[in-house]
A protein has these predicted regions:
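Cytoplasmic helix-loop-helix junction between adjacent transmembrane helices
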Residues: 126-163
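C-terminal transmembrane helical hairpin of 12-TM major facilitator-type secondary transporters
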Residues: 322-371
Length: 441
């Protein structure tokens, strides 16, 4: 039976019952959706970053240079960049639920095919296809959340969802290290081949589960009663009254603020993707030899990142201050990058500085997104954020390729880390140049 109080709650006069009913309804939606969406992102993100762990063995087996690896890791983002807009168009036509499932299933299949790589060309090809397969996944999640949450509740949900990034690092390191060490030689396969195969399986399974677990919209949710559906639909309908008209692409591309945000995001992402793909190598350089131990130790910087995300996000919201909360971690992350390479002969210090670097540059991502969303609204936000995300993610190509090329050129990590630190500091300086009144909301 339905709870009589729940039925009457939306229409009872006075704010306390209505507020209580609304909060309870959104809490119910969050319990149903957000943990599953985080699971989707964690298993999918593992397929993106496991190449960094596979590198520990596959470069030797396939005789790839550091430059080949860097280009292969980065070319993923060229496919991602080229197919993101077409993917978003298809998502609007078919619906976020179906398209997210399609992304995950095709992503898992392509990731598993990486075990067939023999040549640099094949490596580049499969990474490019992986980028095509993943394109639209993050925007798809954001779009799906807009079908349930109004803007005033959406920011918190996005921030909660993005905890999946450090969580995937915390889980991915030990799991990848375990697979590579204990499956190496099974049926004559090296550990890196088993890594690509076994970590693709959860992505495929969760992709199929998405078709059955997620609902296409509020009306299709059998786990909500009619009063809860009316509340959710009413809030979204009320919000739609204030939507602005769709801006032209020319207006978006001619807005200097959009390009300013693109540069800042690019500078954040340079360090983030460097650590994503090269963290296992940096840990190995610091003196850790066992593949399993490398996987376990790489979880430490991601633990620091998760804690930093939560603390900085709460502080920024409480103080309504955005610029310094973003600039300071970026500078700290840049310092961590430089100090980690200078302390590479001292394992404990190197891991400590890598943790500072990760906490600074990776935790900057959710903090960054509070900037453009502070002055972009409605359709302008949708178009502007798409541009910022696409341009900024090109750092995923530039960063690993630059690191690999400089490592082959100089036979060390120092030049690459200093370049990353310089870009990150320049981005932090740009953040402080943004007028406070534009973003501190």
């Amino acid at each position: 039976m339905r709870d009589p109080s729940a039925v009457q709650a939306p229409v009872v006069s006075g704010p306390p019952p209505s507020r209580q009913f609304e909060d309870a309804t959104y809490a119910k939606v969050t319990r149903r959706l957000v943990p599953f969406l985080i699971l989707c992102y964690v298993v999918a993100y593992l397929d993106r970053i496991n190449v960094g762990y596979a590198k520990l063995q596959m470069l030797r087996d396939l005789r790839f240079s550091e430059t080949v690896f860097g280009l292969g890791a980065g070319i993923f983002f060229i496919g991602y960049f080229l197919f993101e807009v077409p993917s978003n168009i298809m998502m609007h036509k078919l619906g976020a639920r179906l398209w997210i499932a399609r992304i995950m299933i095709s992503w898992g299949i392509v990731s598993a095919c990486t075990l067939l790589v023999r040549t640099p060309t094949a490596f580049y090809g499969v990474r490019f296809l992986l980028g095509l397969a993943e394109a639209g996944f993050f925007p798809g999640i954001i779009l799906y959340l807009t079908h349930w949450y109004p803007a005033r509740r959406r920011a918190k949900m996005v921030a909660t969802f993005m905890v999946a990034i450090p969580l995937s690092g915390i889980l991915g390191g030990p799991i990848s290290g375990f697979i590579m060490q204990f499956f190496s030689g099974v049926h004559g396969w090296p550990g890196w081949k088993w890594l690509f195969l076994l970590e693709a399986v959860p992505t495929l399974l969760v992709g199929v589960a998405t078709l059955f677990y997620l609902d296409s919209g509020i009306r299709h949710a059998k786990w909500l009663n009619e009063e809860e559906k009316q509340l959710l639909e009413g809030n979204l309908a009320e919000e739609r009254k204030f939507k602005i008209e769709h801006p032209s692409l020319l207006a978006v591309f001619s807005d200097g603020r959009v390009w300013l945000m693109s540069w800042i995001y690019f500078s954040c992402a340079m360090g983030q993707y460097a650590l994503t793909f090269w963290m296992p190598t940096f840990v190995k350089t610091a003196g850790v030899k066992s593949v399993l131990n490398i996987g376990l130790i790489t979880a430490i910087p991601y633990l620091a990142t998760a804690a930093t995300m939560v603390l900085l996000g709460a502080s920024a919201d409480r103080r309504l201050e955005r610029r310094w909360h973003l600039a300071i971690p970026m500078v700290a992350g840049a310092a961590g990058l430089v100090l980690s390479v200078e302390a590479s002969l001292h394992t404990v210090l190197a891991i400590l500085f890598l943790s500072i670097a990760a906490a600074g540059v990776i935790a900057s991502a959710p903090l960054f997104w509070s900037l453009p969303t502070a002055f972009l609204s409605g359709a302008a936000a949708a178009a502007g954020i798409a541009v910022v995300n696409s341009v900024g993610n090109l750092a995923g190509f530039v960063s690993p390729y630059m690191l690999g090329w400089l490592k082959d050129l100089t036979h060390g990590d120092r030049a690459g880390m200093y370049c990353l630190a310089l870009v990150t500091v320049a981005g932090a300086a740009t953040v402080l140049a943004v007028p406070a009144k534009m973003v501190n909301r």
